[in-house]
Amino acid sequence: MSRHLQVTFDAHDPRALSSFWRDALGYVHPGPPGVDLPEDADPLAAWDDFLARIGVPEEQRNTKSAIEDPDGHGPRVFFQQVPEDKAAKNRVHLDVRAAPGLRGKERMAVLEAECDRLVALGAARVRRHEPAPPMNAGFIVMTDPNTRDYQFCAA
Protein backbone atom coordinates (compact mmCIF):
# COMPACT_ATOMS: atom_id res chain seq x y z
CA MET A 1 0.00 0.00 0.00
CA SER A 2 1.37 3.42 -0.92
CA ARG A 3 1.61 6.28 1.56
CA HIS A 4 0.56 9.89 1.25
CA LEU A 5 3.37 12.43 1.42
CA GLN A 6 3.39 15.71 3.32
CA VAL A 7 6.24 18.17 2.84
CA THR A 8 6.95 20.32 5.91
CA PHE A 9 8.65 23.73 5.91
CA ASP A 10 10.03 25.50 8.96
CA ALA A 11 9.10 29.18 8.76
CA HIS A 12 9.10 32.40 10.73
CA ASP A 13 5.72 33.39 9.20
CA PRO A 14 3.79 30.22 8.24
CA ARG A 15 0.78 32.09 6.84
CA ALA A 16 2.83 34.29 4.50
CA LEU A 17 5.00 31.42 3.29
CA SER A 18 2.00 29.14 2.75
CA SER A 19 0.30 31.90 0.74
CA PHE A 20 3.37 32.24 -1.49
CA TRP A 21 3.53 28.49 -2.15
CA ARG A 22 -0.28 28.33 -2.61
CA ASP A 23 -0.01 30.83 -5.45
CA ALA A 24 3.21 29.32 -6.84
CA LEU A 25 1.74 25.80 -7.04
CA GLY A 26 -1.93 26.55 -7.69
CA TYR A 27 -2.85 24.93 -4.36
CA VAL A 28 -5.52 25.99 -1.86
CA HIS A 29 -5.68 26.58 1.87
CA PRO A 30 -8.09 24.01 3.32
CA GLY A 31 -10.81 25.24 5.64
CA PRO A 32 -10.97 24.41 9.34
CA PRO A 33 -12.27 20.99 10.41
CA GLY A 34 -16.05 20.71 10.41
CA VAL A 35 -16.54 24.07 8.67
CA ASP A 36 -18.26 24.14 5.27
CA LEU A 37 -16.96 27.19 3.46
CA PRO A 38 -18.88 28.92 0.66
CA GLU A 39 -16.94 28.88 -2.60
CA ASP A 40 -15.94 32.56 -2.34
CA ALA A 41 -14.95 32.40 1.35
CA ASP A 42 -11.43 33.20 2.54
CA PRO A 43 -10.14 30.04 4.27
CA LEU A 44 -7.51 31.98 6.23
CA ALA A 45 -10.19 34.27 7.68
CA ALA A 46 -12.25 31.16 8.48
CA TRP A 47 -9.23 29.75 10.35
CA ASP A 48 -8.91 32.99 12.35
CA ASP A 49 -12.60 32.77 13.34
CA PHE A 50 -12.31 29.05 14.16
CA LEU A 51 -9.18 29.49 16.28
CA ALA A 52 -10.74 32.44 18.15
CA ARG A 53 -13.88 30.37 18.86
CA ILE A 54 -11.86 27.52 20.35
CA GLY A 55 -9.83 29.89 22.50
CA VAL A 56 -6.46 29.99 20.74
CA PRO A 57 -4.74 33.28 21.71
CA GLU A 58 -4.21 35.67 18.80
CA GLU A 59 -0.40 35.51 19.12
CA GLN A 60 -0.53 31.73 18.54
CA ARG A 61 -2.74 31.75 15.43
CA ASN A 62 0.13 31.96 12.95
CA THR A 63 2.13 29.01 14.25
CA LYS A 64 0.91 26.58 11.56
CA SER A 65 -0.54 26.66 8.07
CA ALA A 66 -1.10 24.16 5.28
CA ILE A 67 -1.93 24.03 1.59
CA GLU A 68 -3.32 21.20 -0.51
CA ASP A 69 -3.56 20.28 -4.17
CA PRO A 70 -7.19 20.99 -5.14
CA ASP A 71 -7.07 17.99 -7.50
CA GLY A 72 -5.75 15.71 -4.75
CA HIS A 73 -2.69 14.57 -6.71
CA GLY A 74 0.21 16.47 -5.15
CA PRO A 75 1.46 16.30 -1.57
CA ARG A 76 0.02 18.35 1.25
CA VAL A 77 2.45 21.10 2.27
CA PHE A 78 2.64 22.05 5.96
CA PHE A 79 4.32 25.14 7.42
CA GLN A 80 5.33 25.29 11.09
CA GLN A 81 6.67 28.28 12.96
CA VAL A 82 10.17 27.98 14.37
CA PRO A 83 12.12 30.67 16.23
CA GLU A 84 15.57 29.78 14.96
CA ASP A 85 17.22 30.67 11.68
CA LYS A 86 18.50 28.02 9.34
CA ALA A 87 21.85 26.69 10.51
CA ALA A 88 23.09 24.62 7.55
CA LYS A 89 22.60 24.10 3.83
CA ASN A 90 19.35 22.39 2.89
CA ARG A 91 19.87 18.91 1.48
CA VAL A 92 16.51 18.92 -0.29
CA HIS A 93 15.08 21.38 -2.77
CA LEU A 94 11.83 21.60 -4.71
CA ASP A 95 11.54 21.61 -8.48
CA VAL A 96 8.50 23.56 -9.67
CA ARG A 97 8.01 21.73 -12.97
CA ALA A 98 6.70 24.41 -15.31
CA ALA A 99 8.08 23.01 -18.58
CA PRO A 100 7.95 19.19 -18.49
CA GLY A 101 8.89 17.67 -21.82
CA LEU A 102 10.13 20.91 -23.38
CA ARG A 103 13.72 21.37 -24.55
CA GLY A 104 16.09 24.12 -25.64
CA LYS A 105 14.94 27.69 -26.25
CA GLU A 106 11.25 26.82 -25.90
CA ARG A 107 11.86 25.31 -22.44
CA MET A 108 13.96 28.23 -21.24
CA ALA A 109 11.37 30.76 -22.48
CA VAL A 110 8.67 28.98 -20.45
CA LEU A 111 11.00 28.89 -17.42
CA GLU A 112 11.75 32.60 -17.75
CA ALA A 113 8.01 33.34 -17.77
CA GLU A 114 7.54 31.13 -14.70
CA CYS A 115 10.48 32.84 -13.00
CA ASP A 116 8.88 36.25 -13.66
CA ARG A 117 5.57 35.02 -12.21
CA LEU A 118 7.27 33.68 -9.07
CA VAL A 119 9.33 36.87 -8.60
CA ALA A 120 6.06 38.85 -8.74
CA LEU A 121 4.80 36.61 -5.91
CA GLY A 122 7.89 37.41 -3.80
CA ALA A 123 10.55 34.87 -4.83
CA ALA A 124 14.07 35.92 -5.81
CA ARG A 125 16.04 34.74 -8.81
CA VAL A 126 19.49 33.31 -8.00
CA ARG A 127 20.90 32.03 -11.31
CA ARG A 128 20.04 30.45 -14.64
CA HIS A 129 21.58 27.14 -15.71
CA GLU A 130 21.67 26.78 -19.47
CA PRO A 131 20.71 23.50 -21.12
CA ALA A 132 23.58 21.02 -21.47
CA PRO A 133 22.17 18.06 -23.43
CA PRO A 134 21.68 15.22 -23.09
CA MET A 135 21.45 15.18 -19.28
CA ASN A 136 20.65 18.77 -18.26
CA ALA A 137 17.60 20.41 -19.81
CA GLY A 138 18.24 23.78 -18.11
CA PHE A 139 16.66 25.36 -15.04
CA ILE A 140 16.52 28.53 -12.93
CA VAL A 141 17.48 28.50 -9.23
CA MET A 142 15.32 30.71 -7.00
CA THR A 143 14.68 31.38 -3.31
CA ASP A 144 11.36 31.72 -1.53
CA PRO A 145 10.29 35.01 0.10
CA ASN A 146 10.43 33.75 3.69
CA THR A 147 14.07 32.99 4.22
CA ARG A 148 15.85 33.93 1.00
CA ASP A 149 17.96 30.84 1.57
CA TYR A 150 15.66 27.97 0.64
CA GLN A 151 16.40 27.21 -2.98
CA PHE A 152 13.96 25.82 -5.47
CA CYS A 153 14.13 25.47 -9.22
CA ALA A 154 11.80 26.38 -12.03
CA ALA A 155 12.35 23.23 -14.04
Where are these predicted regions, by residue range?
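Vicinal oxygen chelate
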Residues: 2-9, 23-25, 31-33, 37, ...
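A structural signal for well-ordered alpha-helical scaffolds and beta->alpha junctions
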Residues: 14, 60, 111-112
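Hydrophobic ligand-binding cavity/cleft-lining segments
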Residues: 12-23
